UniProtKB/Swiss-Prot annotation:
UniProt-listed GO biological process terms: positive regulation of DNA-templated transcription; positive regulation of transcription by RNA polymerase II
Protein name: UPF0664 stress-induced protein C29B12.11c
Subcellular location: Cytoplasm; Nucleus
Family: Belongs to the UPF0664 family.
Renumbered residue ranges of the record's region Disordered: 147-174
GO annotations of cellular component type: cytosol; nucleus
Length: 174
């Protein structure tokens, strides 16, 4: 079963097919994932080992453990909210956040997602994630720029009294 299905390159079950204008940032092996839907739906999915790939458009998880509840999962970057790095006193560091559902996806409502980096690499992931989020924010802020009022139309002065000093000299030189 796939959650928000992932398309693979032909003949491979770990090499994801990138979307148009999508590029791979980094991949992290040995990552555990748990997805817990918020009430009213109490669906949940877990996997203890898999490959996590971060692209410029989405987060993709491919399960490598045969005992997992699902085969793969993906979420658009914009659908992951309230993300944070967690460093428990005991256990591996993990990254958590809220994933918003996509139309016709496998997640029925908002869900808590937890990515546990059992084989290291979380700080590289956090650095790549923060760069990606910063780019999203820059693009968003550019699209919301307040434009100034248009400049008034230019009208040629009607008399020499309305012209700035030395205007005639400058016009005659050119």
């Amino acid at each position: 079963m796939s959650i928000n299905w992932v398309t693979y390159k032909e003949g491979s079950e770990s090499d994801i097919l990138l979307l148009e204008n999508e590029c791979m940032f980094d991949c992290f092996d040995g990552v555990a994932i748990s997805i817990l839907c918020k009430p009213p739906s109490l669906k949940s999915w877990t996997c203890t080992k898999g490959l996590l790939c971060l692209t410029n458009q989405r987060l993709v998880y491919i399960a490598k453990d045969t005992d997992c509840d699902f085969k793969d999962f993906q979420s658009p970057v914009a659908n992951l909210k309230d993300t944070k790095l967690n460093q428990p006193f005991f256990g591996a560091n993990y990254y958590s956040g809220t994933v918003m559902p996509v139309p016709n996806g496998g997640i029925p409502c908002e869900a808590e997602v937890k990515l546990q980096f059992n084989e290291g690499g979380i700080f590289n992931f956090v650095e790549a994630w923060n760069r990606l989020i910063q780019r999203f924010q820059e693009v968003d802020s550019v699209s919301r720029v307040q434009h100034l009022d248009p400049l008034p139309p230019y009208h040629r002065p009607s008399s020499s009294q309305d012209q700035p000093p030395h205007y005639e000299e400058a016009v005659n030189k050119s």
